Amino acid sequence: MVVNRALLASVDALSRDEQIELVEHINGNLAEGMHISEANQALIEARANDTDDAHWSTIDDFDKRIRARLG
């Protein structure tokens, strides 16, 4: 899986509500036939659904946790 660091940084900078809104927007676009890679969608959803912010202190921490989940 290729991790898009710019995407990770952008998503990580969003508030929890903004992250959830982004996931809903992505899901809506997918339903309409627009293509967003499954890996990028999984990264965004995992970040929006994670409530343990202590583990999200850096992009590298985020990368490691997502890779472990999708592994």
From Swiss-Prot:
InterPro entries: CHP02574_addiction_mod (IPR013406). One of its GO terms (biological process) is detoxification. The keyword Cell cycle does not apply. Keywords: Toxin-antitoxin system. The keyword Signal does not apply. One of its GO terms (molecular function) is toxin sequestering activity. Antitoxin component of a type II toxin-antitoxin (TA) system. Upon expression in E.coli neutralizes the effect of cognate toxin ParE2. NCBIfam families: stabl_TIGR02574. This is Antitoxin ParD2. The lineage of its organism: Bacteria, Bacillati, Actinomycetota, Actinomycetes, Mycobacteriales. The gene is parD2.
